């Protein structure tokens, strides 16, 4: 899960405010880590440490304390622990590295399952016994129970609009000019590389090129479940129509018709001017530019034909964030 460099080791570092379980069988478990200013340097900048120390206190109601830690990691090696993992997620969401350009192998195993409350993170396994004490602090709400927090509680990317903060995980990579509408979803180690409209799902490992549109309810197949190894991506100026989906890479200037799901094993008829139609697996067209994928309304067959280098144009006014 994530790319690795064959050249000189790449490093990153930062200073974090870390929530840690105080006592009990889970003592020492890291609940989260917030890196206000991560950087691609081997040595962390400690200038922010004193300011963070003012926030280092105990939270008995959560059975947690906050403490300041520094971290320096090799991006080409697997995460060693939760603080290491959180630094990698912050690097992605600060757009310091792109999806698939750092090693995330084993990241899930380093993270605790957390109840994300309005009073701060609580270990999910301890939530029930801590609930009374938490309610004594005032109104108690839990946004979700997951290993990943919401992106917007840790990083607010520059130049983007987000309709619903609950639908973006920390580790999402949103380039300036991106608009994520209310039904859009972006997983960690996934996202946009330029100006894009996102009204559908961008799964783990998937990147969307500049000027492309993921239509309402559209989806992209990731590699987290099902054993998939082939990475799905969307090139520049391409469109996934509403309720469509892909399990292959789209090149530049491509369109997938609304409601059509193209998997790697889909049998598609290639229609070229002056030639007989031939049937191939969609995987053979992965990454090819200037294609239109559609479903024949009479036969139901999936067809693909060239688009004569037409482009998808986004409304510029919608992306001046």
From Swiss-Prot:
Q: What is its EC number?
A: 2.3.1.117
The record's active-site residues are: 199 (acyl-anhydride intermediate)
Q: Catalysed reaction per UniProt?
A: (S)-2,3,4,5-tetrahydrodipicolinate + succinyl-CoA + H2O = (S)-2-succinylamino-6-oxoheptanedioate + CoA
Write out the entry's keywords from A to Z.
Acyltransferase, Amino-acid biosynthesis, Cytoplasm, Diaminopimelate biosynthesis, Lysine biosynthesis, Magnesium, Metal-binding, Transferase
**Where on this chain does succinyl-CoA bind?**
201, 216, 219, 242, 257-258, 265, 281, 294-297
Q: Which GO terms describe its molecular function?
A: 2,3,4,5-tetrahydropyridine-2,6-dicarboxylate N-succinyltransferase activity; magnesium ion binding
Q: Which InterPro entries match?
A: DapD_actinobacteria, Hexapep, THDPS_M, THDPS_M_sf, Trimer_LpxA-like_sf, Type2_DapD
Q: Which GO terms describe its biological process?
A: diaminopimelate biosynthetic process; lysine biosynthetic process via diaminopimelate
Q: Which residues bind Mg(2+) 2?
A: 183
- Answer whether the UniProt record assigns the keyword Signal to this protein: no
Q: In which pathway does it act?
A: Amino-acid biosynthesis; L-lysine biosynthesis via DAP pathway; LL-2,6-diaminopimelate from (S)-tetrahydrodipicolinate (succinylase route): step 1/3
Q: Which GO terms describe its cellular component?
A: cytoplasm
Localisation: Cytoplasm
Amino acids binding Mg(2+) 1: 166
Q: What class of enzyme is it?
A: transferase
Where this protein primarily resides, as one coarse class?
Answer: cytoplasm
Q: Write down the NCBIfam families for this protein, in alphabetical order.
A: DapD_actino
State whether it acts alone or in a complex, and with which partners, per the record: Homotrimer.
HAMAP family assigned: DapD_type2 (MF_02122)
Protein family: Belongs to the type 2 tetrahydrodipicolinate N-succinyltransferase family.
So what does this one do? Catalyzes the conversion of the cyclic tetrahydrodipicolinate (THDP) into the acyclic N-succinyl-L-2-amino-6-oxopimelate using succinyl-CoA.
Protein's name in the database: 2,3,4,5-tetrahydropyridine-2,6-dicarboxylate N-succinyltransferase
Species name:
Rothia mucilaginosa (strain DY-18) (Stomatococcus mucilaginosus)
